[in-house]
Structures are given as structure tokens and as C-alpha cells.
């Protein structure tokens, strides 16, 4: 609903006091809503640097500013050594880093991550957790939807646990982990927050 893929049955969606319920995805992106899908979204026939530049071309920047931002993102995400590699040549980890760098090229206020921990190895999980921490440091709001509870609760300030289509509990990770109903219905009695 936040990015505009589905319409709400009721209620409204607001961003900074602006109603965006009926806005298409591209207008929401222009207002600062970034989205990273669970499925691979890297442009497979473009190089890593062209993937990033493709987004920068839509921003009101001159060429020098675009190149500076692209270089900064390549450096920040450790992509310099593969900058000329095509999207279809990247490992899963490199692809994910490229997708996140590309999403940041739009200069979002919020970024929505759909199942960022799905199907990735433990090193990639740590990598994504580090990246999310960096996003928070940049004052970018991060909304994560994921079934990997341990990985997600480790990096969130606040969480909403959905169970059978409704919010079972909202609160800090510690509050969720300590809640008797949450443990009984979703986490299990032996769940421990790391």
C-alpha cells in the first residue's frame, strides 16, 4: 500500500501530511518513497554503474552531480571493482548491493524492503543488516516486511507482528519477544532475541 502496488480497502496513505493514496508509484518515488522488491530487480543488461545512473537521470541534477553521486554510491557499497559488470553477471550479494545503491540514487526519505533476508546466505544477512543500519544513520526511514524474525528484529527500532491478517502486537523488539501471546502464536516458547 505504501508504494502503491495495492490499494487499501479502507483508510488513507499519507507521506509528510500529503495524501498519496491514489498516486501512482512513480509519483510516490518522486516524493521520496523507495522500494526494493524481494525478486531480483537489477537491470540485467546494464552495468552496475549504468543501473545507478539510470535512476540518477530522472533527478534534476547536472552530469557532474550525477557522476559524483554514482561514484559515492559505488564506493559506499563496495561496487567499484564490478562497476562495468552487467547485472546478469553479478552474485546474489553483489546484485542486492547494486539494487540498494540504485534505490538510494533516487534520494528517498523512506525505503521499503520486501523480504530482504529471503534466500540469502548468512554473510549476506549480515551485509544487509549493516546496510540497513547505514540507512538509519542517513536518516532514511526503513520499512521491512520479512518472515525472518531474528534477522529483522535485530535491526529494527519498532516492529508490527502480523498474525492471520491482523496486528498481533506492536512495539520494540524486546516487547515483542517478551509478549506471551506473541510467543504462543508466532515466535515459540524458546525464542530468544539476539
Question: Which functions belong to the PLM regions below?
Answer:
Residues 18, 64-82, 129-133:
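Conserved ABC ATPase "signature" region
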Residues 46-53:
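Short coil-to-helix segment of the ABC ATPase nucleotide-binding domain corresponding to the Q-loop/switch region
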Residues 3:
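Helix-to-loop junction immediately C-terminal to a conserved catalytic motif
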Residues 107:
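Conserved catalytic motifs of ABC-family nucleotide-binding domains
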Amino acid at each position: 500500500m505504501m508504494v502503491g502496488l495495492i490499494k487499501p480497502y479502507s483508510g488513507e496513505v499519507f507521506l509528510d501530511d500529503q495524501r498519496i493514496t491514489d498516486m501512482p508509484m512513480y509519483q510516490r518515488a518522486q516524493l521520496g518513497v523507495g522500494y526494493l522488491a524481494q525478486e531480483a530487480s537489477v537491470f540485467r543488461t546494464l552495468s552496475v554503474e549504468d543501473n545507478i545512473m539510470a535512476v540518477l537521470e530522472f533527478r534534476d541534477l547536472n552530469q557532474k552531480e550525477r557522476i559524483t553521486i554514482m561514484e559515492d554510491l559505488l564506493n559506499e557499497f563496495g561496487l567499484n571493482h564490478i562497476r562495468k559488470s552487467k547485472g546478469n553477471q553479478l552474485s546474489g550479494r553483489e546484485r542486492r548491493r547494486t539494487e540498494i545503491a540504485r534505490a538510494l540514487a533516487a534520494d528517498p526519505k523512506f525505503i521499503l524492503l520486501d523480504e530482504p533476508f529471503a534466500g540469502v546466505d548468512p554473510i549476506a544477512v549480515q551485509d544487509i543488516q549493516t546496510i540497513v543500519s547505514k540507512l538509519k544513520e542517513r536518516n532514511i526511514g526503513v520499512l521491512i516486511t520479512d518472515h525472518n524474525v531474528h534477522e529483522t528484529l535485530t535491526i529494527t527500532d519498532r516492529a508490527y507482528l502480523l498474525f492471520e491478517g491482523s496486528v498481533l502486537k506492536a512495539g520494540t523488539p524486546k516487547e515483542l519477544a517478551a509478549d506471551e501471546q506473541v510467543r504462543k502464536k508466532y515466535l515459540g516458547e524458546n525464542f530468544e532475541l539476539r
